[in-house]
Amino acid sequence: MKLVYFIDGIQGMGGMERIIIGKANALANELNHDVTIISAYSSDKPICYPIDSKVRFVSLDIEKARHDCNALMLVYEQMRVFLQTLCRTRRQLRQIKPDAIFFVWVLGAIMLPFVGGKARKIFESHSSLSNTPHHYFLRLMEQFADTIVTLTEGNAKEFKHCKDVRVIPNYTQKPSKRVIDYSAKRAIAVGRLDPVKGFDRLIRMWKNTEDLHADWTLDIFGEGPLEDELRQQIVSSHLTDSVRLRGYSDNIIDEYSNYSVHLMTSHAEGQGLVLLEAQAAGLPSVTFNFQFGASDVVTNESNGLLVAQDDEIAFQQAMCRIMNSEEDRKRMGEENLRQSCRYTKVSIIKLWNELLKDYS
């Protein structure tokens, strides 16, 4: 089949970009589909994840809307982006003649009802509605999508007007090594350094309990707009000896094995890819029960500790408990390894191929 992925931008270093490119590569290289990725926005940044030679990549070179202008100019800028994107996307689709188009993120939701053509239109939801900017556009998209694919059952229940909603979770690659030393007094947190990930409250909770785990260290991997602010928070909290911002890692999947506990403080997620990555390495997680996905991966007391969203006192207690018990870390980590088979690349790509077979 001829397949197109439409996404606003593919140059980011986040989990969504990694998953989209990974799926496109697998569908082309392993299942022999004809795959094209269309990226709307122009960018000087390199693509962070390798695109298979069998996958065609097209940039529409649309300049993002300016926001440093008055309200009237902002409306003009948004209309310019919409019309340019629509015209250039239609031109590409006329040339490709795809059998199915996957639309991703907000710009994808906006484009889906207007691109026309006979191709099946599939929207991929990578975030809860409450955490999706301008999510009202998704309501119009529901009326036109042939299928909406979500990562979790919770997110699926938010789409009540689409005729076909399916749940296909993310997959994670198998790390080259797993956790061996559960006695290591090292904690890890991973994600883009922006407000939704809640790293500010993680640092605050680490400070509140530092006397109870003075011999532990916390490494936070990721880049983003809050980097300077978080660094200043670490300094002002006198945590420079125990908390480090490690920046971006191009091989994060193999970092988890160097730690004995994973901490996740997100306010919201599409699924929480880092939970799957930690699980694949046999690393137990302490996580808030965010919408959506935490409870799909972590069963409280079995393979990690699940804390009611925003209950920082309970999170601090859970964090200290697992850091004080090597036995719990080992037991929960080994259970994570047993459960990780649910999210292998082979099993998840099979679900995508079954969806495409329904259209053939």
Q: Which ranges hold each PLM region?
A:
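N-terminal strand-loop element at the rim of the active site
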Residues: 5-13, 26-76
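Aromatic "clamp/platform" in nucleotide-sugar-dependent glycosyltransferases that forms part
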Residues: 248, 267
